[in-house]
């Protein structure tokens, strides 16, 4: 029987060529990219090439691209890092009520374990955040806003550029993070055009890439 796979938003099949390249790297170019020997130099080339590719796709600088183990770690690092680094400026964080657990659980951790105050924005009947609620939630203690690009359950697309514009108009120093895990590969995402400071993606869900588990 021919298989019909309808769960690509959860995990995609890797292209055979991608699998072959991964096998080559693991079996031949397996050096530590931080090492100075030949194997290390060859391994470092892959990382540099990947950074160049993402920087070109996103229209950002290579130094602004960071690799993590996946979407959850990227979200965790962005939220916890930004919150802790800016705690002297304020302790108020904003997110939506329908974020992925990688965001919700991290916000709860910051709220319950580290004393931050979190506002969870409501959404309308289409699963989109209410921009008026975002305006009302902003205050002098707000240091970070995190809104997902595309919802992983119902597929609603958030008005990221409009939301970021509202935040930056209120206070340009408030950091804006977007979880674009479900949006990357489906939409053209340019962080600077969107006016966001941090953007998390994961190739697992939207492209024929190797698995991260």
Please name every model-derived segment.
Residues 61-65, 89-91, 140-141, 173:
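Short acidic capping loops at alpha-helix termini that bridge into adjacent secondary structure
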Residues 1-35:
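N-terminal "arm"/small-domain region of PLP-dependent enzymes with the aminotransferase-like
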């Amino acid at each position: 029987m021919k298989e019909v796979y309808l769960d690509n938003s959860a995990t995609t099949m890797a292209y055979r060529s991608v699998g072959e390249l991964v096998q080559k790297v693991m079996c031949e170019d397996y050096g530590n990219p931080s090492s100075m020997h030949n194997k290390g130099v060859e391994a470092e080339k892959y990382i540099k090439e990947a950074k160049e590719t993402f920087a070109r796709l996103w229209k950002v600088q290579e130094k602004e691209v960071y690799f993590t183990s996946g979407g959850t770690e990227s979200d965790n690092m962005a939220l916890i890092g930004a919150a802790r680094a800016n705690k002297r400026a304020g302790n108020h964080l904003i997110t939506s009520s329908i974020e992925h657990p990688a965001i919700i659980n991290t916000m709860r951790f910051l709220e319950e374990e580290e004393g931050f105050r979190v506002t969870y924005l409501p959404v309308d009947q289409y699963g989109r955040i209410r921009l008026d609620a975002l305006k009302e939630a902003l205050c002098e203690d707000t240091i970070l806003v995190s809104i997902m690009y595309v919802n992983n359950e119902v597929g609603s697309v958030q008005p990221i550029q409009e939301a970021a514009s509202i935040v930056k108009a209120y206070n340009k120093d408030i950091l804006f993070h977007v979880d674009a895990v479900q949006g990357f590969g489906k939409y053209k995402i340019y962080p600077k055009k969107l006016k966001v400071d941090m953007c998390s993606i994961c190739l697992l869900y939207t492209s024929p890439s190797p698995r991260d588990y």
